[in-house]
Every structure is written in structure tokens, then in C-alpha cells.
């Protein structure tokens, strides 16, 4: 099946702007496949796996981001979760940070191709950019263990941002390991959402640092 057909099957029925999200998310995945011929953006390119692990994983917890004026995706890679969330939440401004220049150029090109006026791409390291900029929410999928993440996002936390990190099924163990670092920095870590990916492709946990 095509990306669009897979997404039609697996995305939640109550997802905002669902049909438009499916069309644009499928186009995003097509662009990744095209670009992967020249340099590696992701190893996940089969329609079913990409639809689940890239798009569904990004948008299932969309309600946590709803109503936030400005969301920062720290280390966006090929545009996840930032681009799918921006499709679902067109009224929210998104800044996608990606320090690898080729990937940043790809995300910028993809956002332009999709007509995402609510997306800005910056070729910067998250920990540097966040020292001088503010955000309502900072999120990331491929991020360091929580022990390090507490320090990486220290400036954003001091500026009042809410940190929402996509984690796997062992988040509680990470939270326990990070307890002393969190106490030292006077922040709190907690699980705010859990969900299962379709096809038994894994359990996911959203951890909040605040």
C-alpha cells in the first residue's frame, strides 16, 4: 500500500484535519524516500513501518501540545515530531532545530513543499538556541537519557518552558536514574501519557520535565 493508504488505516479517527494531515504526511514521507537516495535521513522507509514509527508516533499525543503558542522540536532529524504535529496544529508556531546542515536543509525544503507557514527551521544545536530564545513547549524524540536531558534543557526550564520528551517503555527506570540530577536542579519528572503503537511496534511514554 501507499503511504497515504497506510496512514488512512492507522491514524486516530479523531485526529484534527485528518484528511489534510494524511495527504501532507504522505508527501513528507515521499520526500524522505527521494532524499534517502542521496544521503541517509532514516532507515525506516517501508510504508507501514514509516507510517507507524514516524507519523503515528509523532501525532498520537497531539493533545499535550494543543493550545501552546510556540513549540520547539529539539533535534528534529527528518522532521519528527515537528512536521506531523505542525500539520495537526496549524495555529501553533513550530521551530524545528537540527544541527546537521543537510538534514536542516531537507526539513526546510519539506516544510516549504507542504506549505507549512507555521514552521521555522533553524540549523542550530538545541542547547545553544534555547539559551537565547523562549518556547512554550520543548519536545524531542531522539534525545539523551533523562539524566542528561535535565541539563540540556536547563535554560528552557528556567525560562518557563514545559519539556515533553518521547520515550520508550522503560521511562520509569530513566526517571529513577535521573532523580538526583532532577533534585539538584529543582525540577520534576513525570509520565504524562502512555500509548501503544499499532502492529505491536512498541510502547511509548511521554515524560514531562518541569
Swiss-Prot record:
Gene3D superfamilies named among the record's database cross-references: Vaccinia Virus protein VP39 (3.40.50.150)
InterPro entries: rRNA_ssu_MeTfrase_G, SAM-dependent_MTases_sf
Domain of life, source organism: Bacteria
Database matches in Pfam families: GidB (PF02527)
GO molecular function, one term: rRNA (guanine-N7-)-methyltransferase activity
A GO cellular-component term linked to this record: cytosol
Compartment annotation: Cytoplasm
Positions of S-adenosyl-L-methionine binding: 75, 80, 98-100, 126-127, 141
Keyword Manganese in record: no
EC number(s) from the headed UniProt entry: 2.1.1.-
Entry keyword set: Cytoplasm, Methyltransferase, rRNA processing, S-adenosyl-L-methionine, Transferase
EC class of the enzyme, as a word: transferase
Function of the protein: Specifically methylates the N7 position of a guanine in 16S rRNA.
HAMAP family in UniProt: 16SrRNA_methyltr_G
Family: Belongs to the methyltransferase superfamily. RNA methyltransferase RsmG family.
Protein name per Swiss-Prot or TrEMBL: Ribosomal RNA small subunit methyltransferase G
Organism of provenance: Solibacter usitatus (strain Ellin6076)
